[in-house]
A protein has these predicted regions:
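Bacterial N-terminal signal peptides that target proteins for export
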Residues: 1-9
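Intrinsically disordered, low-complexity segments enriched in proline/serine/threonine
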Residues: 6, 19-22
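Bacterial N-terminal signal peptides
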Residues: 8-17
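Well-ordered beta-sheet/strand-loop patches within structured domains
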Residues: 22-66, 136, 140-143, 163, ...
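Cationic-aromatic interfacial patches
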Residues: 25-169
Length: 558
């Protein structure tokens, strides 16, 4: 196997001369420092090369060494310092965080470290150039790894147009210097890892699924008729084995025979529930598809969603609302405990619900629906042109701007609708509060760049569907009354009864929340519930695919 040192001039050597004496008998610290300084000063700004590769922290790294007066950070004149071993150890284990050790020069660092250890064993001192190479790579490894831990390997806003991330920032150069001074390299990097229990649970799931992948392969359930309770088939024996491997069926309940009994039905329901399927207990086409998804795909899903955790703020808030688009679900969380759940309807694939965080500050009871221009011209105008009575039946008004932020109501009978088009529509449409209003009786506002909010709906039947991507981007919620009661908690004027009365009154009212509540619109295709159940969902917007491609193309430069 070819050694990774590549003639020991692995970092920056091809662009800079060697200082006389650096490889000879002189090993004073000032020789190594002078060599380090010359390399950094002669390197192109923001383009420090290492065997043809750009050092990822090339914007931060020179400033770090300048502050130190170019003193080496990771070695003495004889050998690597203890903090170097601590960093190498951390990098060796960083795959537990779904990060890649080789991204942080692990192979080169281990080789250079071993070369210095060999030199010490021979009572020799390592060449200054080797020490400088090692030092630069170590510093780059810390800065890059730290950056990936706190804000992810890629920037989601460069992958998705509809993803706004409040990613964390740290002055990693200063963080590194403090860690070196305190001799706490490993502890410092661990302190940067997300502390949310959901991240920790998903990280444990990654370890569990990697162990499963190293064990007995998941058997494939062949295509065939629907398997259901009281039936017999050879495939049922295979089904039992498959469900035992993922813990959906306990080993003690596995009779090993071909009968679809009560215990197997419950195991199938459990499997279906944690994969977002209707838990009917029968193994049809969709359940077979989920059962036959390779474990490598599931591991990749977990890794992608750990990356998404790193895009979130450090604190989600002691009270916050989580909407998982891929799960069509909403959770209210207090002190890391889920206290309220409900189904939601999200945007269609071509009108996707965006991902972002905001602060809910008020609710609007009996809201008007100000129809977005795109919906008015693309969807409603053709209906109006076919039936001029459509607006009256739908309780809609036609408005026209008259300047100074004022509008006037226009008689729809005075408008020549057939002359209008998507490019020629000088009106606005507004639907009155009432049973036909798609916003229902209440909406929950957290101002944002996307104009997205949570709201009641007049189409209650959609919550009976398993997949619920039907909206234009806003989020319809299953339990608006319970949710309103929660967010207005603390205001004695807004009891459940008073909220119901206000909704029934048909009068539009804006009510400020007693205190703002964080709202996080997320997209998770893999997560772990509080009870330890590993959940997977279909990638309804193909965002897993986009993220996989971005990670393959390159990682974020700090």
């Amino acid at each position: 196997m070819k050694k990774p040192l590549l003639t020991v001039t692995l970092c920056f050597l091809m662009i800079l001369p060697v200082i006389p004496g650096a490889h000879g008998t002189e090993y004073r610290s000032d020789i190594a420092s002078a060599l380090l300084r010359k390399r950094l000063e002669r390197a192109s700004p923001a383009r420090i090369l290492c065997e043809g590769r750009v050092i990822c922290s090339s914007r931060i790294l020179p400033k770090f060494y300048a502050r130190r007066d170019y003193r080496l950070a990771w070695t003495s004149e004889e050998a690597p310092l203890p903090q170097a071993s601590a960093l190498v150890k951390f990098i060796r284990e960083v795959d537990k965080e779904a990060l890649i050790p080789l991204d942080y020069h692990l192979d080169l660092l281990e080789y250079l470290q071993s070369e210095m250890v060999k030199a010490k064993a021979k009572a020799e001192k390592p060449p200054a150039a080797l020490r400088v190479d090692f030092d630069l790579l170590m510093t780059d490894a810390f800065l890059l790894c730290g950056s990936h831990i706190i804000s992810g390997r890629v920037d989601p806003e460069k992958i998705y147009e509809d993803w706004f991330a409040r990613r964390r920032y740290e002055d990693l150069s200063s963080v590194l210097q403090v860690a070196l001074d305190m001799n706490s390299i490993e502890e410092t990097l661990r302190s940067l890892i997300p502390k949310n229990p959901g991240y920790e649970r998903l990280k444990k799931a990654l370890l569990d699924y990697r162990r499963m992948a190293a064990g007995e392969p998941w058997p494939v359930i062949p295509e065939g008729p629907i398997l259901r309770k009281d039936g017999r088939a050879e495939e049922i024996i295979t089904l039992r084995k498959r469900l035992v491997l993922t813990g959906d069926l306990s080993a003690s309940q596995n009779t090993g025979n071909d009968l679809f009994d009560d215990a197997l039905e419950e195991a199938v329901k459990k499997f279906q529930g944690r994969h977002g399927l209707e838990p009917d207990g029968a193994v049809g086409r969709e359940t077979r598809r989920m059962l036959n998804t390779p474990i490598e795909t599931r591991i990749r899903q977990i890794e992608l969603n750990l990356e998404r955790w790193r895009w979130l703020p450090v604190e989600l808030g002691p009270r916050h609302v989580l909407v998982n688009i891929a799960n069509f679900g909403l959770e209210v969380v207090e002190n890391d405990k889920v206290i309220l759940t409900m189904k939601v309807v999200v945007g269609k694939n071509y009108q996707r619900t965006p991902v972002f965080s905001g602060k809910m500050t008020y609710v609007e009871v009996n809201p008007y629906w100000n129809v977005p221009a795109s919906i008015a011209t693309e969807e409603l105008l053709p209906k109006i042109q076919k039936d001029t009575g459509y607006l009256k039946k739908e309780q809609m008004k036609v408005l026209r701007d008259i300047g100074n932020k004022r509008t006037e109501v226009v008689d729809p009978g005075e408008v020549n609708w057939h002359e209008l088009s998507e490019d020629n529509f000088p009106y606005r449409l507004r639907q009155e509060p009432g049973p036909k209003n798609p916003l229902g009786r209440i909406k929950f506002m957290f101002p944002n760049r996307y104009g997205v909010y949570l709201h009641d709906t007049s189409e209650r039947g959609l919550f009976d569907r398993t997949r619920r991507e039907f909206s234009h981007g806003c989020i319809r919620i299953e339990k608006p009354l319970e949710f309103a009661e929660y967010v207005l908690r603390g205001d004695p004027d807004w009891t459940r009864e008073n909220i119901q009365a206000a909704m029934a009154s048909k009068k539009t009212r804006v009510v400020m929340l007693p205190e703002p509540i964080g709202v996080h619109i997320l997209y998770w295709t893999a997560w772990v519930d509080e009870d330890g159940t590993v959940q997977f969902r279909d990638d309804i917007y193909d965002r897993d695919e986009d993220l996989t491609k971005a990670l393959q193309e390159g990682t974020l430069i700090p």
